[in-house]
């Protein structure tokens, strides 16, 4: 069974996002889901080639799995408790 840490360490490439969104995040040094959720949404406004469509795509993907920006370890634990079925499936 996967753990919250396993989910936190999922590669951003496993999120089924566009190549542009993935490349923009890689240029920001983001490689994992935990690194992504640790960022402020405003951080994405400064990135070259990161337009509104890419920002919306990333935000939508996070929201679809119950995640958000600026998550702390406590937020992740709360998420894990509420999304145990999702963790088991992924």
How would you label these PLM feature ranges?
Residues 1-90:
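Compact, charge-rich alpha-helical regulatory domains located at protein termini
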